[in-house]
């Protein structure tokens, strides 16, 4: 089956494969997903801290097992003192409709902390059928 090039007048345009490779490799450097976090939890203690950056009330209703609640607005150096300087963090919020995880990631990066965002947030976690704590 032969494919014709995309019409340049259309909204969806073809991308340069090398540019696409660079783009998606960069995304994977900063993002993970619910499945990968779940697999890490199943295999033993992950080598990162899972931060639920939602409100305490939302956290209390249910959260990823082992996650620590630290709302994104409270991510400051003194609240990270309990974690080693080299600790890596995976942050999540309510879901794709929420930018709390992005805000948390910015704050952590500004504090020179390693961070990834868990795509899907708690909504994605529940959609996958994973247990809450």
Language-model region placement:
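Alpha-helical scaffolding within the catalytic cores
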Residues: 74-79
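Small-side-chain structural scaffolding
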Residues: 17, 34, 53, 67, ...
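Active-site neighborhoods of enzymes that stabilize oxyanions during catalysis
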Residues: 129-133
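Catalytic cysteine-centered active loop of the rhodanese-like fold, especially the PTP/DSP P-loop
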Residues: 80-126
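Short acidic-hydrophobic, aromatic-tinged amphipathic segments that line or gate anion-handling sites
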Residues: 70-71
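Short active-site oxyanion
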Residues: 44-50, 65-66, 88, 114
